Amino acid sequence: NQFEGTKVDQNGSSRFHVDVAKLGLGDDLGRILNTQYEVFTVNGDTPNLIFDQRDYYSAEGYGTFSAALQDGLNQSLAPTTDGDPVIRVFPAWPKAWDAKYKLLAKDGFLVSSSIESEEIQYVEIESQLGETCRVRNPWDCSVVLYRNGVKAESIEAGENDLMEFETSENEVIVLVKEGTTPDQYRTSELTSVDYHTVNDTESNIIYT
């Protein structure tokens, strides 16, 4: 219906970028997002963000744009309709884009992560409800798990393997790949972005 409506009066909003993110196609997502963004800024002629092909733009377009960004950064979908949600960090993120984020996942998990030069640095998970946490391993090696700043266990897992562990309410879990520590990233900042991360001695990794 969206496609047909767009052909008739151009009053439609494509969800292609959201679908691409759900499918894990990061580089395609980057191209689609850039293309959609450029329709508002062609030659600088549309500073008020009016669509460059008409004098209006359907409001849902802005929502699908932000939804695609979030799905590219973090997903917590269940593999089946009656399954449990599984967290995936940077499941569909363009390889050339460095990024940091903090987003809420299902079952009350506040997830933070960072990627730079195509390398995911860590995964921090704040458990707000104390539920069982399920995460796909973003690395091609084993993972070290820290609980509230203390090294707790090593998880033998390969890339994209399912990792499952219990959490307590308000517990902070940090996952790093084998051979690294959370302290390496306590004050890390992306070299391609002009901002700073403030350190806090009461937590492994703090964002502002």
Question: Could you say what each language-model-derived stretch is?
Answer:
Residues 1-13, 51-62:
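Solvent-exposed loop and edge beta-strand segments that line ligand/cofactor-binding
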Residues 13-26, 72:
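Alpha-helical support elements that line or immediately flank enzyme active sites
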Residues 25-208:
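Non-catalytic C-terminal accessory modules of carbohydrate-active enzymes
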